Regions:
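Sec-dependent bacterial lipoprotein signal peptides
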Residues: 1-12
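Short amphipathic alpha-helical surface micro-motifs
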Residues: 10-11, 42-49, 161-167, 199-202
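Short, compositionally biased
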Residues: 12-137, 210-226
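Terminal interaction module
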Residues: 15-19, 82-85, 171-226
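An exposed tryptophan-centered "aromatic clamp" motif
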Residues: 116-142, 146-201
Length: 226
């Protein structure tokens, strides 16, 4: 379990209650601290992600990394079920990303394998292979599901200014040149062989897209505050 400490300003009045909860806009630092934007000091803290969703009975607390992934394909080829859930309501991006990393299609036999021996002989998920590269206190980054990107979209007015303050790249909300469209880790349930869901950060809408198309992605991380 990830152990975190929350940096807070001392209350001006000893009778004033101190808020120990973690809220959207708080900053996850490389040393495991979660700090309020009001006490964040770039000379002291190294930011890695910004919180966009508090923990509840349906999902862990979630934070979005400061920078995004350049346009990349969901899959190398079509006609390839990559074993994601296909759910538009589950907060299961981590499980989906594991499926993307471990499900491969043999280029010769076109048989799906759970593990690959030589990546040159298998179709894979270029998107999925970009996840799990960063680790902070045993937590790994992954591609969010449809539902998780919905949470991020709802918090953008709070999160984007903090990302910018931390020196990161704000989530793109401009529809120009399809810049607002981001991959989810969720295949379209009715057509998992060929399509996955895109999410628009301009208006919160969703769109089915061929998995071989290239779009941006934004990785997230979850953690378990005590």
């Amino acid at each position: 379990m990830m152990v975190l400490s929350v940096g807070l300003l001392a209350a001006c009045d000893e009778h004033e209650p101190v808020d120990l909860d973690i809220h959207p806009g708080y900053i996850l630092c490389s040393d495991g601290q979660i700090v309020s934007p009001s006490v964040f000091d770039a000379g002291v803290h190294t930011p890695v992600a910004v919180v966009f969703a508090e923990k509840n009975d349906k999902h862990q607390a979630l934070a979005v990394l400061l920078d995004e992934i350049a346009p990349v394909a969901f899959a190398d080829t079509l006609s390839f079920d990559q074993k994601t859930s296909g759910s538009e309501t589950e907060y299961d991006g981590y499980v989906n990303t594991v499926a993307l990393q471990t499900t491969h299609l043999d280029r010769d036999s076109l048989v799906v394998k759970d593990n690959k021996a030589d990546p040159r002989n298998y179709y894979t998920s270029p998107l999925g292979l970009l996840a799990f590269r960063h680790h902070w206190f045993f937590q790994s980054d992954y591609v969010p599901s449809v539902a998780e990107l919905g949470l991020l979209y709802s918090a953008l007015t709070v999160v984007n200014p903090v990302i910018k303050r931390c020196g990161g790249t704000p989530v793109n909300r401009s529809p120009e040149n399809a810049g607002c469209w981001y991959w989810t880790s969720t295949e379209v349930a009715q057509n998992k062989l060929n399509q996955a869901w895109l999410f628009s950060m301009a208006d919160g809408s969703r769109h089915k897209a061929p998995k071989t198309n290239s779009y941006r992605a934004r990785l997230i991380v979850e953690y378990n505050p005590l």
